[in-house]
Each structure stands twice: as structure tokens, then as C-alpha cells.
């Protein structure tokens, strides 16, 4: 990702300033953010900034010069011209929002991302369990095959493409019926611009799109677990005792097929926090 952003066309120093910036101004910005350094050295400095134990130059003119005000942390020891520092990961300042720390920007937007991820995983779990149970019960029928087809498509389609497709269909073509927006914020100012109001409808499309892939995985896991458990001897015994199919599934099958699903859900939640950027508008 680091190298990809650096090979894209455009000058970040020019983005910080404007088209009328002088060469002297551009050079100052490049020196401030390290854009004038070789790409390989920039990457090593980037890793050094993220590392809890980092190496810093004692030369005040060097880009990696240690300043407690800038990096925080404390110096463990020094040798020659290098200081070894213990610190929290340093995310620098944003060159798009000059002077604002990246850590602060993330802290401002992270709550909404967590809300989106939680909403997505809830949708994925509820629909995934329902469709997985239906698919397992009707194993081999057209219902099972239809659910399996939808699940396979859900796992295959990238989130960014699903986001574009769903926003176009439900936010543009069917907007008169759905009343959903293509873009929007979780909190929006009221008509008087005085207070932020929660807009649940702006959460529906992103949450559903982000939940498609984990939903598809949960469907497969629940279905396979259901089929495997239902073939066990104790399930046949439960049926022989006269328990209804619903009781067998609820009391015996689901409880014994949940472990892989719970493991998958915890892993998917972590990936959702990172992947939410593809569907957040």
C-alpha cells in the first residue's frame, strides 16, 4: 500500500499548497514531510515510526531527529549518533489537513467505523444463521442450491464493487421507493444547522454491503455444521424419542455447530474495521 500510493501520479507537496506555489515553498513542504527522500528510505522511516522501539538520529537537521514533543516516549540508551527510543506508534501529521495529527483524525472517525462494523456483523450473523439453517434443513433441494448460489456470488464480489452497485440501484434508481441516499453521514445537521441528528437510513446500505461477504461465509459454515451434526447418532436418537424437528435443531444441532461460526465472526469483525473504508462514503 505504501509503494502504491507513492507511484500514483501527482505531487503530494503540490496538494498541500496549490498550483501557484513557488519552487521554494514546494521544497520546504517536501523537506518537512520527507517527500524529498528516496522512496526506500521513506519506507524504512515509516516502519521506524510505527515500531515501539525505534532508532533516531542525534543530528537536528536529520528527518529522524528525536524530539520528545514530536514523538513522545523516552530514550532507552544512545550510542554513537543514534538514540534508541521506546514510544507509541507515531502516525505523524496529515499533509492534507495541515498541522492535524493523523492519530486525532482517526480518533474522530473511528467511532462511526465501529458502529458500521457492528451493524454489519449483526446483519451478517442474523441473516447468515437464518439462511444457513434453511439451506441445511433443505439440503439438496432447489432452496439449498439457490442459497448456495447467492452465497457463492456474495463471497466472490469485491466490497467496493458491491458498494457501487447497491448505491446505484437502491440509492439512485429506486430512491423514490427506498428513500435511501447514495452518500451521507451517520450524523447530519438539522435544517437550522444547530444540532446533529442520527440518520439510521444512511447506515443501511453501507452496513448491508459490508456484511455481504461475512454473511456468505456464515451461511456456508452454519449449513455444513448443521448437515454434519444432523448425521450424528444422538440426533437420530432425539428424533426417535419424538422430539419435533424444530426442537432437535434448537436444542441439539445449533449448540453443537456454533464453534466454527463464532471463530469466523470474531475474525471477520477485525477485518471489517480495516475494510470499512471501501464502503464508507
Residues of each region from the PLM?
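Pore- or pathway-lining transmembrane helices of multi-pass membrane proteins that form conduits
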Residues: 20, 144-168, 206
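An internal, D/E-rich "acidic patch" concept
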Residues: 36-125, 129
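Active-site-proximal flexible loops/turns
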Residues: 4, 18, 139, 163-165
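Hydrophobic alpha-helical segments of integral membrane proteins
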Residues: 25, 29, 39-54, 102, ...
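Hydrophobic alpha-helical transmembrane segments of membrane transport/permease proteins
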Residues: 1-51, 55-69, 170, 174-197
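Alpha-helical transmembrane segments of integral membrane proteins
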Residues: 110-115, 119-143, 159, 172-175, ...
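Phosphate-coordinating loops and pocket residues in cytosolic domains that bind phosphorylated ligands
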Residues: 18, 31, 96, 148, ...
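Transmembrane helix irregularities
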Residues: 8, 154-157, 273
